[in-house]
Amino acid sequence: MQIKAEEISKIIEDQIQNYEQRVEMSETGTVLYVGDGIARVYGVQNAMSMELLEFPGGIMGMVLNLEEDNVGVALLGSDVGIKEGDPVKRTGKIFSVPVGDGVMGRVLNPLGEPIDGLGPIDAAEVRPVEIKAPGIIARKSVHEPMPTGLKAIDAMTPIGRGQRELIIGDRQTGKTAVCLDAILAQKETGIHCFYVAIGQKKSSVALVADTLRRHGALEYTTIISATASDPAPLQYIAAYTGCTMAEYYRDSGKHALIIYDDLSKQAVAYRQMSLLLRRPPGREAFPGDVFYLHSRLLERAAKVNDSLGAGSLTALPIIETQAGDVSAYIPTNVISITDGQVYLEPNLFNAGVRPAINVGLSVSRVGGAAQIKAMKQVAGTMRLDLAQYRELAAFAQFGSDLDKGTKAKLDRGARLVELLKQPQYQPMPSNEQVASIYAATRGHMDDVPVEDIRRFEAALLTFLRDTRKDVLDAIKEKQVIDEAVEKALTEAIAAFKQGWTA
């Protein structure tokens, strides 16, 4: 076979014409130091704050400190395979996570990756975890109720859509249980729920997921889990990941609820990172920007105005106190950021009052505008009655000769305390709460022995559901107790009491 010279030149010519010079440029650096989830990297001069850097083995790191000759990086994974001198590549991307309906019913890590073994996520889009909170013009005042299913909260410290209500108390006082009840109460409301576990035991997170699954609530809930064994940067970023996913619904004109369990552990993780990054410590060794850590997170919970879709994001952050000290640094910070707090007390919990809510110290600063009128009508005097009861109960220990009025207040208070007790994972619809509290505050339970109050309440609600459903439906529909509803409710309670035996 003879090769012709012109053919060779033609082939070479074609090759030259079709040649594409592909040069892949990437700015790289070198690891100077690594340990405890933190790395110092030299040579990535143009790195941005919050940018992702790629380490060997596919581990990502997030730039936190921008210094003169190196950058401080928080590693979003294990630092076991990374050593001094390893190459580090810039990605040019800001840390983002998947959002959309694909995350519903899933258990994810703070990077937005599934850890439940149910396959990949079908994401609508990806969004940065750090997003600026809505401005003043974009917001609307809280005016719609967000029921929790707990009588003590819905009656006296009501929560509205778009509110930030702090759940604060010592360990083992039922903080998580209150929040899980709030999730279970959203079954009929169409609110999308997010539970962010920060620094929890893996067994605790598994128990939460199992509880939600058993009650049919996991299908509208997403769990973001940064457990105690995860590196500090993952515990720090988990809350922002959950918030970004929940904001998708707020910005789509829908409603979302997010629970941060708990922000005390997030602050501890942030303190650990800050000290390792050599940032100067302040009070209780926390860095100076620990207030901003929580304020920029909680300010993203909002009720947005009608022109932006009228969606909302409600936040229930949890803070764990030490021996009831609410004047410590982190508790006071979060109390000042939120729109009220529900204070849970160990003494009440141990006395069998569950949920163990201290009515005197709990407050909702904006929720009153969101409470349904029917509840306002029946529970208006409740807080005062309970406050007087607590005061008189302390004095009543000293003397037995009480006048009629004092005795009546003590009896009414004891019955109200009993009425506000509620079993775990049994949220109560608003119309049933109204009927139950109406019976107590209007004196229909005054002749019922204190130990029989809960049995009386359960039997009364069963009676109303079975024979006088029209009364419950009227309360649900009108959301106000007018003359007709009051007359029907009084008659129904009287009819029930005739057939009820203690």
UniProtKB/Swiss-Prot annotation:
It is found in: Cell inner membrane. Its main location: membrane. GO terms for cellular component: plasma membrane; proton-transporting ATP synthase complex. The record marks S362 as: Required for activity. Its EC number is 7.1.2.2. Keywords: ATP synthesis, ATP-binding, Cell inner membrane, Cell membrane, CF(1), Hydrogen ion transport, Ion transport, Membrane, Nucleotide-binding, Translocase, Transport. It catalyses: ATP + H2O + 4 H(+)(in) = ADP + phosphate + 5 H(+)(out). Coiled coil: none annotated. SUPFAM superfamilies: C-terminal domain of alpha and beta subunits of F1 ATP synthase (SSF47917), N-terminal domain of alpha and beta subunits of F1 ATP synthase (SSF50615), P-loop containing nucleoside triphosphate hydrolases (SSF52540). ATP binds at G169, D170, R171, Q172, T173, G174, K175, T176. It is a peripheral membrane protein. Gene3D superfamilies: 2.40.30.20, ATP synthase alpha/beta chain, C-terminal domain, P-loop containing nucleotide triphosphate hydrolases. GO terms for molecular function: ADP binding; ATP binding; proton-transporting ATP synthase activity, rotational mechanism. It holds the Pfam family ATP-synt_ab. Produces ATP from ADP in the presence of a proton gradient across the membrane. The alpha chain is a regulatory subunit. Belongs to the ATPase alpha/beta chains family. F-type ATPases have 2 components, CF(1) - the catalytic core - and CF(0) - the membrane proton channel. CF(1) has five subunits: alpha(3), beta(3), gamma(1), delta(1), epsilon(1). CF(0) has three main subunits: a(1), b(2) and c(9-12). The alpha and beta chains form an alternating ring which encloses part of the gamma chain. CF(1) is attached to CF(0) by a central stalk formed by the gamma and epsilon chains, while a peripheral stalk is formed by the delta and b chains. This is ATP synthase subunit alpha. It comes from Desulfovibrio desulfuricans (strain ATCC 27774 / DSM 6949 / MB). The gene is atpA.
